[in-house]
């Protein structure tokens, strides 16, 4: 055990608090750089979840849709644990059918 680990243990410091603060700051910066207001971001999140839920059952309690910034590039990241696919019958619209081969 290093001296720093001993002092941290003695003072019961939470090593994760610095990481949590860093993640929060990155989230704030991502929101600022993307120029998306919170209402629009929430609407996007709901719509993304709605579309994904049409095809697979997702665990909403464990899921997360967020903005992440790396090297001045902001990305919308959806981390959605999939429970199982939803059974669907394949429908082909008349306009999508292939023309008959001669």
Swiss-Prot record:
GO biological process: cell division; regulation of division septum assembly
Organism: Synechococcus sp. (strain CC9605)
Recorded superkingdom: Bacteria
Full protein name: Cell division topological specificity factor
Pfam families: MinE (PF03776)
Keywords of the record: Cell cycle, Cell division
Similarity comment text for this entry: Belongs to the MinE family.
Transmembrane segments: none
Cited HAMAP family: MinE (MF_00262)
Gene3D superfamilies recorded: Cell division topological specificity factor MinE
Role description: Prevents the cell division inhibition by proteins MinC and MinD at internal division sites while permitting inhibition at polar sites. This ensures cell division at the proper site by restricting the formation of a division septum at the midpoint of the long axis of the cell.
InterPro entries, per the entry: MinE, MinE_sf
């Amino acid at each position: 055990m290093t001296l720093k680990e001993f002092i941290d243990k003695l003072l019961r410091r939470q090593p994760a608090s610095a990481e949590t603060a860093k993640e929060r700051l990155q989230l704030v910066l991502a929101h600022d750089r993307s120029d998306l207001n919170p209402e629009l971001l929430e609407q996007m999140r709901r719509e993304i979840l709605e579309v994904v839920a049409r095809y697979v059952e997702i665990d909403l309690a464990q899921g997360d849709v967020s903005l992440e910034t790396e090297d001045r590039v902001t990305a919308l990241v959806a981390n959605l644990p999939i429970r199982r696919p939803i059974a669907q019958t394949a429908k082909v619209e008349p306009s999508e059918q292939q023309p008959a081969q001669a």
